[in-house]
């Protein structure tokens, strides 16, 4: 039944079929596409990102190894990036049977939507499943008291499909990023409450509308993957599957040094030791620079001229940040 549905789908749809992709967080394949420079040279040496280059070369050399000319092997690898909005698979009318989907529709190559044959309907996108150590993550920020991050996932449709529904997963706490993503390593975190809304200004989505899916992502100590399924409700059972790389950052860690530097400037002004200090603008980065680290250490030592009372009060302020 599954193979028959796939054949009927191939006959029924037009040649141009892209439908959508994760834009917040950003899907692996879209990052590779957006970087560009994957058309020359054929072997992928021009791909700027290391992980994307590794994915390209995986597909390219797979077909070169069986005698495909460089141009054909390159076309297979380029297709993986070009079709960033068509990471799709066909489940048939039993698309709600998740065990069927796991067993027969996507038993492997989850990030590539089980596409691992350049001669098949959806091509070969297996490079997206390379367990490379350096896939670029989007950052989710939490403070020291949070064990999860709540936000709206955005799925950017190049063609709207209604009715439909979403399922959102993240890799488990124990997942090793040196291993590919498998169903056994995924934890379901939601998908209910999704809605088609006006694009609120998502920089990675050019569509006027997008799907917004509220989720709460549990904390992970290292890099992890979000896996999203967008499933059409129709007899063909076409679904779209995307991986996005994530890591948690701590707002306190990011901004601590910038705020410490501001506290130093304020203290020096109060003591008339720095009348010409320049106030940082609102866009001051939270990334700790060397002067900001020195400012932090300065406050830890007690402030200007070791004036203990003033220094102590500022230290208490820093500890509260």
Curated annotation (Swiss-Prot):
Q: Which Gene3D superfamilies match?
A: chitin-binding protein cbp21
- Subcellular location per the Swiss-Prot or TrEMBL entry: Host membrane
Annotated glycan sites: 192
What does UniProt give as GO cellular component? host cell membrane; membrane; viral occlusion body
Q: Which residues form the signal peptide?
A: 1-18
Transmembrane intervals: none
Q: Which UniProt keywords apply?
A: Disulfide bond, Glycoprotein, Host membrane, Late protein, Membrane, Signal, Viral occlusion body
One family from Pfam that matches here is LPMO_10
Region described as Disordered: spans on this chain: 301-321
| Function noted in UniProt | Component of the virus occlusion bodies, which are large proteinaceous structures (polyhedra), that protect the virus from the outside environment for extended periods until they are ingested by insect larvae.
Subunit structure of this chain's protein: Homodimer; disulfide-linked.
Q: What is this protein called?
A: Spheroidin-like protein
Q: Which organism is it from?
A: Orgyia pseudotsugata multicapsid polyhedrosis virus
State the taxonomy lineage.
Viruses, Viruses incertae sedis, Naldaviricetes, Lefavirales, Baculoviridae
- Gene from which this protein is expressed: SLP
């Amino acid at each position: 039944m599954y193979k028959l549905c796939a054949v009927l789908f191939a006959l029924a749809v037009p040649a141009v079929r892209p439908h959508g992709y994760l834009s917040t967080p950003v899907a692996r394949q879209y990052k590779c596409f957006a970087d560009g420079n994957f058309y020359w040279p054929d072997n992928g040496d021009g791909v700027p990102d290391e992980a994307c280059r590794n994915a390209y070369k995986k597909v390219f050399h797979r077909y070169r190894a069986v005698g495909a000319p460089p141009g054909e092997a390159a076309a297979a690898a380029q297709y993986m990036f070009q079709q960033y909005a068509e990471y799709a698979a066909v489940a048939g009318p039993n698309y709600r049977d998740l065990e069927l989907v796991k067993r027969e529709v996507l038993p492997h190559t989850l990030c590539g939507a089980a596409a691992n044959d350049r001669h098949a309907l959806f091509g070969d996108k297996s490079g997206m499943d390379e367990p490379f150590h350096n896939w670029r993550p989007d950052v989710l920020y939490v403070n020291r008291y949070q064990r999860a991050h709540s936000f709206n996932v955005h799925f950017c449709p190049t063609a709207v499909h209604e009715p439909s529904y979403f399922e959102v997963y993240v890799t488990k706490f124990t997942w090793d990023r040196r291993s590919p993503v498998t169903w056994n390593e995924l934890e379901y975190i939601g998908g209910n409450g999704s809605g088609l809304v006006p694009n609120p200004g998502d920089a990675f989505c050019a569509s006027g509308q997008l799907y917004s899916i509220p989720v709460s992502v549990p904390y992970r100590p290292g890099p992890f993957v979000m896996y999203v399924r967008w499933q059409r409700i129709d007899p063909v059972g076409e679904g779209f599957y995307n991986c996005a790389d994530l890591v948690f950052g701590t707002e306190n860690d990011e901004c601590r040094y910038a705020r410490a530097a501001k506290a130093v400037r304020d203290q020096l002004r109060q003591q008339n030791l720095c009348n010409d200090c320049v106030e940082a603008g609102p866009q001051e980065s939270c990334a700790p620079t060397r002067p900001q680290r020195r400012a932090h250490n300065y406050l830890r030592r007690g402030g200007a001229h070791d004036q203990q009372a003033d220094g102590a009060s500022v230290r208490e302020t820093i500890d509260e940040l």
